[in-house]
Amino acid sequence: MRVVILLVSLIAVPYIMWQVMRIKGNKNITALENVQTGKSVSIFEGNDYALMDVEEYLVYCLPGIVDMGMDDEMLKTMAIIMRTSIYGEMYPELVYQSPYAEEGGETGLEVATGTDSAMYNLIRNGSCLVNEDSLTEVRYDKSELMDKWGGSYYTYMNRLCSAVLATKGQVICYEGMFIVPVYHQVSVGQTVSAQEIYGKEIPYLQGTDSKEDITCDGFSVTQVVDGLRIKKLCDLYCEQNPAAYVDYSKDASGTNEDSSSADDETKADNGRETTAGDKATEKGSADNVDKNTNKENEINILEATEHGFVKYVNVFGKTMTGQTFAGVMGLQSANFHIDQVDDGYRIITIGKGNSLGLSLWGGEAMARQGRTCDEIIKKYYANVDIVDMAQ
């Protein structure tokens, strides 16, 4: 009998403690449940539709983009970024300019020209209802977060709620319009412009120093892959995606002159010639650009941007974009260097992501140095304002 009682206790006590944590978690978000901004999201929950204020909605979306080891100021930064994204999706005509928009697409500049515009005031003072299906954010429900965080649920929810409440209504604007607040994990030592990555000038997406990123574990990753394996992976992918191999010849004249100038930089100070590894770490792949597309027995980079993001790569006589090649090979960014070694091809990858917009690693470093979320945002997004829509 004692053994039975002991077994029941071992099972029941943790269960009771777990239920207590669940109750505490629910109490923790009461303050946010009472926040009413007039901007609501229609969600499907419990076999029925319900309305959730955008501020509460943020709390359940943030776990998908933040690490709970982040500093509180970085959590605030990400709350402002995600709120800006949601507002931009609610009011797409008031997004200043998106790096993903088609050339010549609507920028919203004719709809509103600043913070005194009628449309801007409508957003601040009016109501809005959107269906969750029209938003790109991913929302976690309470049970999913409880399963994910376990006993840390209450602590983590409290931190997220605090970050959202501390920044309530704050969004990032350029000339009175919402920006598209793109971000990445780790830059190549500095962020780059939208012009470099997407070929279009976007004033709030300019390059800035982010030297803290080079201290990140995995900033530079080196792997050696057999050439036949690379060919097989690329061919298999292109069988499933026929457009993956592209015609580079139509862009070969004129567009590559800037990239080829990087070859002149292979000499370092004091006359020392840098090695492939040195140069890849310093400036991505720009040092080994070779515009010869007829090398059917080799893999070589055809064109790269100023900071080493590969635009086109030759794979045994066929051409792929650098982004496609990085995806096929599972590289952490399209900033890579390739050279042939005895065992195959050495691929050195720099950074994580496209180095556009906010660097999560760099922003976290700033937060731990005592910088505020406003300072972090204004470092990585040029000439922006943080506007309080709740006032």
State each model region's role.
Residues 1-391:
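Conserved, single-site charged/polar hotspot
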